[in-house]
């Protein structure tokens, strides 16, 4: 694998944001094999639901989102889910790191949130040298290298 895709990169491929044009252009011209993990899928799924629920229904907060899903189901996000699954079907899905000491060390050393540290550890374990992300927290990491989008 040549490039790991982060949630902050995947979401604008599917939902129109201020970074959509850049993300789509980069993705359509990216050489090599792209990868992601199931933790990124879960995060992108959740973030997409939150964005759509807020835009369409003014729903903010996880509790209200959960309540809406219990009452109405996921119908409001069918197109997003279909598109998310389509993006992921074109990626190599790598297993998330389970090296707890590595994840903790990366989080502490680079002041990263746990999920970002998990992504870094996952990239390192799978020898994925680059990450496509709009998350600036990854700019302080040298392995994987944050690519310019």
Residue ranges and their predicted role:
Residues 29-33, 90, 141:
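Structured helix-beta-strand junction loops
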Residues 2, 120-149:
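Acidic, PIN/NYN-like endoribonuclease modules and their adjacent C-terminal/linker elements
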Residues 5-6, 12, 36, 96, ...:
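Histidine- and aromatic-rich ligand-binding microenvironments
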Residues 10, 40, 118-119, 137-138:
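Alpha-helix capping/helix-boundary segments
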Residues 1-40, 46-61:
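Short, well-structured N-terminal submotif of metal-dependent ribonuclease cores
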Residues 82-129:
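Active-site neighborhoods of divalent-metal-dependent phosphate/nucleic-acid chemistry enzymes
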Residues 11, 41, 45-100:
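Active-site-proximal, substrate-binding regions of enzyme catalytic domains
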């Amino acid at each position: 694998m040549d490039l790991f895709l982060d949630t902050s990169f995947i979401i604008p491929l599917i939902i129109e944001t201020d970074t959509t044009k850049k993300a789509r252009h980069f993705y359509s011209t990216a050489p090599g094999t792209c990868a992601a993990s199931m933790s990124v899928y879960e995060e992108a799924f959740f973030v997409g639901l939150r964005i759509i629920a807020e835009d369409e229904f003014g729903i903010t907060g996880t509790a209200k989102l959960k309540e809406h899903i219990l009452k109405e189901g996921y119908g409001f996000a069918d197109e997003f889910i279909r598109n998310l699954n389509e993006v992921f079907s074109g990626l190599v899905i790598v297993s998330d790191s389970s090296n707890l000491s590595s994840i903790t060390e990366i989080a502490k050393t680079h002041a990263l949130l746990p999920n970002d540290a998990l992504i870094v550890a996952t990239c390192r374990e799978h020898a994925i040298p680059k990450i496509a992300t709009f998350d600036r927290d990854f700019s302080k990491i040298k392995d994987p290298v944050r690519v310019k989008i």
